[in-house]
Swiss-Prot record:
This is AA9 family lytic polysaccharide monooxygenase A. Residues 234-261, 271-306 have a biased composition (Low complexity). It is an enzyme of class 1 (oxidoreductase). Disulfide bonds join C62-C183. Its cofactor is Cu(2+). It comes from the Eukaryota. The gene is eglD. It holds the Pfam family AA9.
Length: 348
């Protein structure tokens, strides 16, 4: 009998581990940089894919062993698209990314390497929460573990990019939310003029009782408050403040031309979700329990456009199939077509 219980416990533990995720690779402008999750790679990778659940732990910064640098640093420049590729086990096409029960937001932070390693200077540059009946993690799974950001116009130097998932399937109890994060080493080679704000400390940016951390995703709710600071708009130099109770706009599926991949990499036919965020429109009402991902991505995040009249602000949607909002961008912006379903206002 004891043996049976032991086997059941081991099976349950194995199932839990298999549901977790880490970042395995990065793409720059749709070019695969190869696996980066090793000591000779470019991702500060933890020894396993277990989550961090104590928001006061030093491991919140870059995960376990995250203070240790790795061999490589990726070169990027302002305006480059950086795509993070998450998996729970491997880059194989059959990998399920993360358990479908692990719904929650996806965010990206950036900090100068020295300050970031010490847990300071973290600036949120992208986030996606819950919108139009789907969680950010559902979109991530549909996109085969990929989501993207645009490198801001910051001064040249070495930085850390910190993609993060908060899984809320146990978020209805204090200490139940699961945090997954790694730090990617990058070197910005362009001479930008927009200095990052002072940022926040991690640990320190979250509390166990924050509404977006202690959150019951199984009860009826009308909005999800993404925790942490507000997203930096990429131009101001002020301090990152606290985020409000609505998820930020996130550009849906970006059009991607698959680049040659290194041997053993996963199928790259899915297009990553592109996060380019500036403002936070109000989220729509959510059902008591979020629907499961269908495996296709028809948009990740609110359009943020409001009504069909008026000028559309930077980084918000301005066109695309089935889109009925405003199509005229504010002065100095142009409506860029990412794919037939999503057009976005960007600097001309």
């Amino acid at each position: 009998m004891k043996s049976t219980f032991g086997l059941l416990a081991l099976a349950a533990a194995a199932k839990l581990v298999s549901a977790h995720a880490t970042v395995h690779a990065v793409w720059i402008n749709d070019v695969d940089q190869g696996a980066g999750n090793s000591a000779d790679g470019y991702i500060r990778t933890p020894p396993n894919n277990s989550p961090i659940t104590d928001v006061t732990s030093a491991d919140m910064t870059c995960n376990v062993n995250g203070k240790n640098s790795v061999a490589k640093t990726l070169s990027v420049k302002a305006g480059d698209k950086v795509t993070f590729e998450w998996h729970h086990d491997s880059r194989s096409a059959s990998d399920d990314i993360i358990a479908s029960s692990h719904m929650g937001p996806v965010m990206v932070y950036m900090a100068p390497t020295e300050k970031g390693t010490a847990g300071n200077g973290w600036v949120k540059i992208a986030e996606e929460g819950y919108s139009n009946g789907k969680w950010a993690v559902a979109n991530l799974i549909a996109n085969k573990g990929k989501h993207s950001i645009t490198v801001p116009d910051v001064p040249a130097g070495e930085y850390l990019l910190r993609p993060e998932i908060i899984a809320l399937h146990e978020g209805n109890r204090q200490g139940g939310a699961q945090f997954y994060m790694e730090c990617v080493q990058v070197k910005v080679t362009s001479a930008g003029t927009k200095t990052l704000p002072a940022g926040v400390s991690i640990p320190g940016a979250y509390k166990a009782t924050d509404p977006g951390v202690l959150f019951d995703m199984y009860n009826s709710f009308t909005s999800y408050p993404i925790p942490g600071p507000a997203v930096w708009d990429g131009s101001s130099s002020g301090s990152s403040g606290s985020s409000d109770s609505s998820p930020a706009t996130t550009a849906p599926e970006a059009s991607v031309t698959s680049a040659p991949t290194k041997q053993g990499s996963a199928d790259t036919s899915a297009s990553p979700t592109t996060f380019v965020t500036a403002t936070k429109p109000t989220t729509t009402a959510a059902p008591a329990a979020p629907p499961a991902s269908t495996g296709s991505n028809s948009g990740s995040g609110s359009s943020g456009s409001g009504s069909a009249s008026g000028s559309v602000k930077i980084y918000q949607q301005c066109g695309g199939k089935n889109y009925s909002g405003a199509t005229s961008c504010e002065a100095g912006l142009t409506c860029k077509e990412w794919n037939p379903y999503y057009h976005q206002c960007l600097k001309a």
